[in-house]
Amino acid sequence: MNEIKTADNAKTYCGFIAIVGRPNVGKSTLLNKILGQKISITSRKAQTTRHRIVGIHTDGPYQAVYVDTPGLHIEEKRAINRLMNRAASSAIGDVDLIIFVVDGTHWNEDDEMVLNKLRAAKAPVVLAINKIDNIKNKEEMLPFITELTSKFDFAHVVPISAQGGKNIAELEKIVRESLHEGTHHFPEEYVTDRSQRFMASEIIREKLMRFTGDELPYSVTVEIEQFKLNERGTYEINGLILVEREGQKKMVIGNKGQKIKQIGIEARADMERLFDNKVHLELWVKVKSGWADDERALRSLGYMDE
C-alpha cells in the first residue's frame, strides 16, 4: 500500500486497531460512533457484519485504521459461518491494538471463545464493556469487571455506551496512545477502504435485516449488478437480493410488494446521505438454493476475498 506523505515534515502517527467480540455486542455501532458516520451496518440481529470492514479515522497527525470484524461464534455448520469466523480471527493477528467489546449485561460461551482466541494475540487488548446505559446501578458492574480481569490481563478496561457515546473519547485517547510514528496509509478524507458498490450492498442488506425482523434467517445476501453514474449525474444502482427458498422471497417482497418498496426507499435515502448524490435504486429478489453452503458462490459474492 502506498503511504501518504504530509506536506511538511511534521510528525504523524498511524496504526491498526481490531474491534472484536461475539455477535451483537455493538462492534459496528462503536465503529460508526468513532467515525461520526455509518459505514458498518447494524441491526438487532446477531451476525449482521459478514465482512471485515475497514474504517479510517484521521484526527490531525493521528490516523487510526479500524477493522470491524464479523462476530466470532461457536456455530460453524455452514460455510458462511466458517468464513466469517476465519475473517474475524485473522484480523487479530497483525494489529497494534485490540478492542474486545462485551455486553455489560451478560457473558456467554461465545465471549469465552473470543477471550481464548485473544490469548495468542501479540497486541495489547482493551476491554470495552458496552451497553452500560442499560445498567441502572453501576456498582453492579464491579463483580463483572473483577471476574473478567481475573481471566485476562487487559491493558485497559473502559465501560462505554457505543450508542450514546459515553466514554468513547476516553477509548479514542487510548487508541491514539497505541499509534506508532509513521506516515498515514490513507488520505485524510478517507473514512473507509471499501468501494461505493460494496457499501451499497451492505446498506440494502441492513434494511433487509431491519424490515424482515426475525422472519428471515441469515441465508440472504445482496449482489450489486449495476452501479453507474448516468448523464444526469445520478447513480443508477441495481441490487439483486438472493434468498434460499421461495418462501423467503415472498417475505422480502411482502404483501403487494410493500416490504421491498420500503426497503428500497430506506436504502436509497441512506445511500444518498453516504454518497452525497442522487440515487436511482432498483431491487429484485431471486431464489438461489444453498448459496450459503457453496464456497464457489461465496467466492463470487465476495465472501472469500480476505
Swiss-Prot record:
Region (G3): 68-71
Location of region: G4: 130-133
Region described as G1: spans on this chain: 21-28
A UniProt-annotated Pfam family: KH_2
Region (G2): 47-51
SUPFAM superfamilies: P-loop containing nucleoside triphosphate hydrolases (SSF52540), Prokaryotic type KH domain (KH-domain type II) (SSF54814)
GO CC list: cytosol; plasma membrane
Keywords: Cell inner membrane, Cell membrane, Cytoplasm, GTP-binding, Membrane, Nucleotide-binding, Ribosome biogenesis, RNA-binding, rRNA-binding
Principal localisation: cytoplasm
Domain KH type-2: 212-289
BP GO annotations: ribosomal small subunit assembly
Topological category with respect to the lipid bilayer: Peripheral membrane protein
Domain Era-type G residues, every copy: 13-181
Sequence segments annotated as region (G5): 160-162
InterPro entries reported for this sequence: G_ERA_dom, GTP-bd, GTPase_Era-like, KH_dom-like_a/b, KH_dom_type_2, KH_sf_prok-type, P-loop_NTPase, Small_GTP-bd
Compartments, as annotated in UniProt: Cytoplasm; Cell inner membrane
Quaternary structure annotation from Swiss-Prot or TrEMBL: Monomer.
Descriptive protein name: GTPase Era
Lineage of origin: Bacteria, Pseudomonadati, Pseudomonadota, Gammaproteobacteria, Pasteurellales
Gene: era
